């Protein structure tokens, strides 16, 4: 797993004071991004270091009784539970084979939706484990109807297997802040059929906005990950011990 992250204060969104390095391998949809600060650190960073420590992923397998699935759950990580995530934006998310992610939700007839509020658990019909969605901490399944995550216009229709480059999502009700728990907050769930030939990696890069709760100053960070997706032959090992590319929550 390869990852980078950094912090910046609101107001420094033009790129001034930051040197941007982005290496893209478009053919395989593998992307790396790094930003190097050349300006003075923010007062927040000086006071307590960088509170946003990057993105991380849990990789697991799931069997729905018929098929095996690879599941990647993405998290935003912080140094404490005092921070609430407002939005994730400017994303670049995909798989090396370009086929994207599985959908299994209320919008199946339209190709499936990235809205978590569509990810219901209806036996024999819809299963959130094999559905792909983005979220700002809220739950799905029995909690889907209460999920207040909304998609940015940059998401387009919000339908289909792939996320448009630059897409974002946000907490529609920031007065109901979604604070980190155990130093992290769930921001996305990505399902892929384990029988897919040629699937090797998933890449995730995005910016994130966060604060200390309603009415407080907004800060921004970003990070990127390249996540190895195990080969089909690894399913037996995964079933025995599991595979994680981050330390699991207590």
Which ranges hold each PLM region?
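Cleavable N-terminal signal peptides
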Residues: 34-35, 45
